[in-house]
Amino acid sequence: MSKYDDYELVKFSSVRLPYKYDALEPFIDEETMQIHYNKHYLGYLKKFNTAVEKYDINEPVIKIMQNIDKYPIEVRDNGGGYVNHSMFWKMLKPNPKKKNNVPYGISLIKIIEDFGTYGQFKEYIIEASQKRFGSGWVWWVMNRDGSTNILATPYQDNPYMPEYQSFPLLGIDVWEHAYYLKYDADRTRYIKNIFNVINWEEVNRRIVSANQNIFDVRIMN
Protein backbone atom coordinates (compact mmCIF):
# COMPACT_ATOMS: atom_id res chain seq x y z
CA MET A 1 0.00 0.00 0.00
CA SER A 2 1.58 3.26 -1.07
CA LYS A 3 1.18 6.52 0.80
CA TYR A 4 -1.08 7.65 -2.05
CA ASP A 5 -3.51 4.69 -1.91
CA ASP A 6 -6.39 6.32 -0.05
CA TYR A 7 -9.45 6.21 -2.31
CA GLU A 8 -12.34 3.79 -2.17
CA LEU A 9 -13.99 2.89 -5.47
CA VAL A 10 -17.74 2.90 -5.97
CA LYS A 11 -19.65 2.30 -9.24
CA PHE A 12 -17.27 2.56 -12.17
CA SER A 13 -14.06 0.76 -11.27
CA SER A 14 -10.42 1.53 -11.93
CA VAL A 15 -8.24 0.00 -14.59
CA ARG A 16 -5.40 -1.67 -12.75
CA LEU A 17 -2.00 -0.24 -13.61
CA PRO A 18 -0.49 -3.02 -15.79
CA TYR A 19 3.07 -2.49 -14.51
CA LYS A 20 4.83 -1.28 -11.37
CA TYR A 21 5.11 2.41 -10.64
CA ASP A 22 8.81 2.43 -11.50
CA ALA A 23 8.46 0.30 -14.64
CA LEU A 24 8.52 3.22 -17.07
CA GLU A 25 11.82 4.57 -15.75
CA PRO A 26 13.90 6.36 -16.91
CA PHE A 27 11.31 7.98 -19.17
CA ILE A 28 8.55 8.47 -16.58
CA ASP A 29 9.59 8.47 -12.95
CA GLU A 30 8.12 6.39 -10.14
CA GLU A 31 6.87 9.29 -8.02
CA THR A 32 5.03 10.82 -10.96
CA MET A 33 3.33 7.49 -11.67
CA GLN A 34 2.29 7.04 -8.04
CA ILE A 35 0.78 10.49 -7.80
CA HIS A 36 -0.70 10.35 -11.30
CA TYR A 37 -2.46 7.03 -10.72
CA ASN A 38 -3.43 7.18 -7.07
CA LYS A 39 -4.21 10.86 -6.64
CA HIS A 40 -5.27 12.19 -10.02
CA TYR A 41 -6.79 9.12 -11.69
CA LEU A 42 -8.51 7.66 -8.64
CA GLY A 43 -9.56 11.17 -7.68
CA TYR A 44 -11.30 11.60 -11.04
CA LEU A 45 -12.93 8.21 -10.59
CA LYS A 46 -14.25 9.00 -7.13
CA LYS A 47 -15.70 12.34 -8.23
CA PHE A 48 -17.15 10.78 -11.38
CA ASN A 49 -18.92 8.10 -9.38
CA THR A 50 -20.27 10.77 -7.05
CA ALA A 51 -21.63 12.74 -10.01
CA VAL A 52 -23.12 9.62 -11.61
CA GLU A 53 -25.03 8.86 -8.41
CA LYS A 54 -26.01 12.50 -7.87
CA TYR A 55 -27.55 12.82 -11.33
CA ASP A 56 -28.83 9.23 -11.49
CA ILE A 57 -26.94 8.40 -14.69
CA ASN A 58 -27.38 4.83 -15.92
CA GLU A 59 -25.42 4.71 -19.18
CA PRO A 60 -22.20 2.90 -20.15
CA VAL A 61 -19.26 5.19 -19.71
CA ILE A 62 -18.52 5.77 -23.40
CA LYS A 63 -22.18 6.52 -24.09
CA ILE A 64 -21.89 9.16 -21.38
CA MET A 65 -18.91 10.63 -23.20
CA GLN A 66 -20.69 10.53 -26.56
CA ASN A 67 -23.64 12.41 -25.06
CA ILE A 68 -21.65 14.56 -22.67
CA ASP A 69 -23.51 17.77 -23.53
CA LYS A 70 -26.52 16.37 -21.67
CA TYR A 71 -24.66 16.38 -18.37
CA PRO A 72 -23.25 18.94 -15.91
CA ILE A 73 -19.62 20.01 -16.12
CA GLU A 74 -18.44 17.77 -13.26
CA VAL A 75 -19.49 14.74 -15.30
CA ARG A 76 -17.48 15.98 -18.29
CA ASP A 77 -14.37 16.87 -16.30
CA ASN A 78 -14.22 13.85 -14.02
CA GLY A 79 -15.68 11.33 -16.45
CA GLY A 80 -13.22 12.51 -19.08
CA GLY A 81 -10.37 12.21 -16.61
CA TYR A 82 -11.45 8.67 -15.76
CA VAL A 83 -11.87 7.51 -19.37
CA ASN A 84 -8.72 9.19 -20.66
CA HIS A 85 -6.46 7.76 -17.99
CA SER A 86 -8.06 4.31 -18.19
CA MET A 87 -6.91 4.21 -21.81
CA PHE A 88 -3.59 5.96 -21.17
CA TRP A 89 -2.22 3.34 -18.74
CA LYS A 90 -2.69 0.62 -21.36
CA MET A 91 -1.08 2.72 -24.08
CA LEU A 92 2.24 2.63 -22.24
CA LYS A 93 4.59 -0.26 -21.53
CA PRO A 94 7.99 -0.69 -19.87
CA ASN A 95 11.16 -0.42 -21.92
CA PRO A 96 13.88 -1.19 -19.34
CA LYS A 97 16.60 -1.93 -21.90
CA LYS A 98 15.87 1.34 -23.73
CA LYS A 99 15.34 -0.49 -27.01
CA ASN A 100 14.28 1.41 -30.10
CA ASN A 101 10.50 1.40 -29.70
CA VAL A 102 8.83 1.84 -33.08
CA PRO A 103 5.37 1.10 -34.48
CA TYR A 104 4.81 -2.08 -36.43
CA GLY A 105 2.00 -3.88 -38.23
CA ILE A 106 -1.22 -1.96 -38.74
CA SER A 107 0.06 1.05 -36.74
CA LEU A 108 2.99 1.50 -39.09
CA ILE A 109 0.77 1.02 -42.15
CA LYS A 110 -1.66 3.72 -41.00
CA ILE A 111 1.17 6.09 -40.06
CA ILE A 112 2.76 5.76 -43.50
CA GLU A 113 -0.63 6.16 -45.22
CA ASP A 114 -1.61 9.31 -43.34
CA PHE A 115 1.68 10.95 -42.31
CA GLY A 116 4.35 9.66 -44.68
CA THR A 117 6.90 8.52 -42.11
CA TYR A 118 7.06 7.70 -38.42
CA GLY A 119 9.36 10.69 -37.95
CA GLN A 120 6.77 13.01 -39.45
CA PHE A 121 4.06 11.44 -37.28
CA LYS A 122 6.09 12.22 -34.17
CA GLU A 123 6.64 15.78 -35.32
CA TYR A 124 2.89 16.30 -35.70
CA ILE A 125 2.34 15.04 -32.15
CA ILE A 126 5.13 17.22 -30.76
CA GLU A 127 3.75 20.26 -32.59
CA ALA A 128 0.22 19.60 -31.32
CA SER A 129 1.52 19.30 -27.75
CA GLN A 130 3.39 22.59 -28.07
CA LYS A 131 0.31 24.38 -29.40
CA ARG A 132 -1.96 22.96 -26.69
CA PHE A 133 -2.09 26.01 -24.41
CA GLY A 134 -2.54 24.90 -20.83
CA SER A 135 -3.75 21.46 -19.80
CA GLY A 136 -5.09 18.82 -22.14
CA TRP A 137 -4.37 15.75 -24.24
CA VAL A 138 -2.89 14.99 -27.65
CA TRP A 139 -4.50 12.14 -29.57
CA TRP A 140 -4.02 10.07 -32.66
CA VAL A 141 -7.59 9.38 -33.77
CA MET A 142 -9.47 7.51 -36.44
CA ASN A 143 -12.42 9.19 -38.11
CA ARG A 144 -15.52 7.39 -39.30
CA ASP A 145 -14.26 7.42 -42.89
CA GLY A 146 -11.13 5.50 -41.83
CA SER A 147 -8.73 8.42 -42.06
CA THR A 148 -6.54 9.33 -39.09
CA ASN A 149 -5.19 12.60 -37.78
CA ILE A 150 -3.68 14.27 -34.73
CA LEU A 151 -6.09 16.00 -32.38
CA ALA A 152 -5.46 18.13 -29.28
CA THR A 153 -8.23 18.49 -26.70
CA PRO A 154 -8.47 20.82 -23.70
CA TYR A 155 -8.69 19.71 -20.09
CA GLN A 156 -10.14 16.17 -19.91
CA ASP A 157 -12.02 16.24 -23.20
CA ASN A 158 -11.61 13.15 -25.38
CA PRO A 159 -12.35 12.12 -28.98
CA TYR A 160 -15.59 10.33 -28.06
CA MET A 161 -17.26 13.65 -27.21
CA PRO A 162 -19.72 15.13 -29.74
CA GLU A 163 -17.50 17.95 -30.97
CA TYR A 164 -14.76 15.48 -32.00
CA GLN A 165 -16.66 12.29 -33.01
CA SER A 166 -13.61 10.13 -33.53
CA PHE A 167 -12.02 7.02 -32.05
CA PRO A 168 -8.84 7.34 -29.94
CA LEU A 169 -5.95 5.17 -31.09
CA LEU A 170 -3.28 6.79 -28.93
CA GLY A 171 -3.55 9.45 -26.25
CA ILE A 172 -0.82 11.39 -24.47
CA ASP A 173 -1.53 13.32 -21.29
CA VAL A 174 -0.04 16.82 -21.48
CA TRP A 175 -1.28 18.06 -18.14
CA GLU A 176 1.65 19.25 -16.02
CA HIS A 177 0.98 16.53 -13.43
CA ALA A 178 2.04 13.97 -16.07
CA TYR A 179 5.59 15.27 -16.39
CA TYR A 180 6.46 18.22 -14.14
CA LEU A 181 8.37 16.34 -11.41
CA LYS A 182 10.84 14.95 -13.93
CA TYR A 183 10.78 17.41 -16.82
CA ASP A 184 9.86 20.67 -15.07
CA ALA A 185 8.28 22.91 -17.73
CA ASP A 186 9.85 21.05 -20.67
CA ARG A 187 6.76 19.44 -22.19
CA THR A 188 8.54 18.82 -25.49
CA ARG A 189 11.24 16.67 -23.89
CA TYR A 190 8.55 14.68 -22.08
CA ILE A 191 6.72 14.06 -25.37
CA LYS A 192 9.90 13.00 -27.16
CA ASN A 193 10.74 10.57 -24.36
CA ILE A 194 7.28 9.07 -24.02
CA PHE A 195 7.64 7.54 -27.48
CA ASN A 196 10.10 5.13 -25.83
CA VAL A 197 7.27 3.57 -23.81
CA ILE A 198 4.32 3.59 -26.24
CA ASN A 199 2.57 0.22 -26.27
CA TRP A 200 2.19 -0.34 -30.00
CA GLU A 201 0.47 -3.68 -29.42
CA GLU A 202 -2.36 -1.83 -27.68
CA VAL A 203 -2.46 0.80 -30.43
CA ASN A 204 -2.71 -1.99 -33.02
CA ARG A 205 -5.59 -3.52 -31.08
CA ARG A 206 -7.41 -0.21 -31.05
CA ILE A 207 -6.93 0.27 -34.80
CA VAL A 208 -8.46 -3.16 -35.44
CA SER A 209 -11.37 -2.23 -33.16
CA ALA A 210 -11.89 1.05 -34.99
CA ASN A 211 -11.77 -0.70 -38.36
CA GLN A 212 -14.49 -3.03 -37.14
CA ASN A 213 -16.65 0.00 -36.31
CA ILE A 214 -16.41 -0.51 -32.56
CA PHE A 215 -17.16 3.15 -31.82
CA ASP A 216 -19.03 2.27 -28.66
CA VAL A 217 -18.66 1.14 -25.07
CA ARG A 218 -16.08 -1.64 -25.35
CA ILE A 219 -12.89 0.28 -24.61
CA MET A 220 -12.33 -0.52 -20.97
CA ASN A 221 -11.51 -4.23 -21.33
Predicted regions and their residues:
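Feature for soluble, non-membrane regions of globular proteins
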Residues: 2-221
